[in-house]
Amino acid sequence: MEVIKLKDEFIKLGQALKAAGCVNSGLEAKIVIKEGQVCVNGEVEYQRGKKLHEGDTVTFDGETIKIEK
């Protein structure tokens, strides 16, 4: 499980995928999110700009990313 420490109140979903090394670019993040390959807290998420806060969990391609403060 990858852990992302928040520097601000939130991080956007596309940025979180890049920070965790799950994707190589913002374009790649946009594509996998739009295709419904990413879940936030167990629900498929289609918005790249979705704000993630402390306690949120992202799953993509068998990887889990936990958002912490």
Question: Could you describe each region identified by the protein language model?
Answer:
Residues 3, 57-69:
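A positively charged, amphipathic N-terminal helix/segment that binds anionic biomolecules
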Residues 1-11:
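A detector for short, charged/polar N-terminal pre-domain segments
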Residues 9-54:
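A basic, amphipathic helix-loop patch mediating RNA/tRNA/ribosome contacts
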